[in-house]
Amino acid sequence: MPVYVEFDVPADLADDALEALEVARDTGTVKKGTNETTKAIERGTAELVLVAEDVSPEEIVMHLPELADEKGITLAFVETQDEIGQAAGLEVGSAAAAIIDAGEADSDVDDITAKIEELR
């Protein structure tokens, strides 16, 4: 497990988070990539942040969990960058993504957030 992964997210919960990202991509607003995700967290506009566990070097996303904690934003870990990229509508992987406006996935994001807070 990478240094920056603070807790294990069950596979079904990670899948739910990826589904919510897909729905938010189509009906709301998402930010893709580490830089855009970092800005969304700093501005406090992110509702849910997804970070891949297979990022190398780890330093690329190492700051995200701490920053999200400071801002009170829920963060979920998923296995691969490719999963995040695909859910965000990219043809390549993405180390991180943020849901800004969940759109039709609003209740899903609320459920995911509650479940992740229980894990911590």
UniProtKB/Swiss-Prot annotation:
Keywords from the named record: Cytoplasm, Ribonucleoprotein, Ribosomal protein, RNA-binding, rRNA-binding, tRNA processing
MF (Gene Ontology): ribonuclease P activity; rRNA binding; structural constituent of ribosome
Localization terms from the record: Cytoplasm
Biological processes, Gene Ontology terms: translation; tRNA 5'-leader removal
InterPro entries linked: Ribosomal_eL30-like_sf, Ribosomal_eL8/eL30/eS12/Gad45, Ribosomal_eL8/Nhp2, Ribosomal_eL8_arc
A single Gene Ontology CC term: ribonucleoprotein complex
Gene3D superfamilies assigned to the protein according to its UniProt record, in alphabetical order: 3.30.1330.30
Superkingdom of origin organism: Archaea
Similarity annotation: Belongs to the eukaryotic ribosomal protein eL8 family.
Function of the molecule: Multifunctional RNA-binding protein that recognizes the K-turn motif in ribosomal RNA, the RNA component of RNase P, box H/ACA, box C/D and box C'/D' sRNAs.
Assembly description: Part of the 50S ribosomal subunit. Probably part of the RNase P complex.
Protein name, as recorded: Large ribosomal subunit protein eL8
Species the sequence originates in: Haloquadratum walsbyi (strain DSM 16790 / HBSQ001)
Lineage: Archaea, Methanobacteriati, Methanobacteriota, Stenosarchaea group, Halobacteria
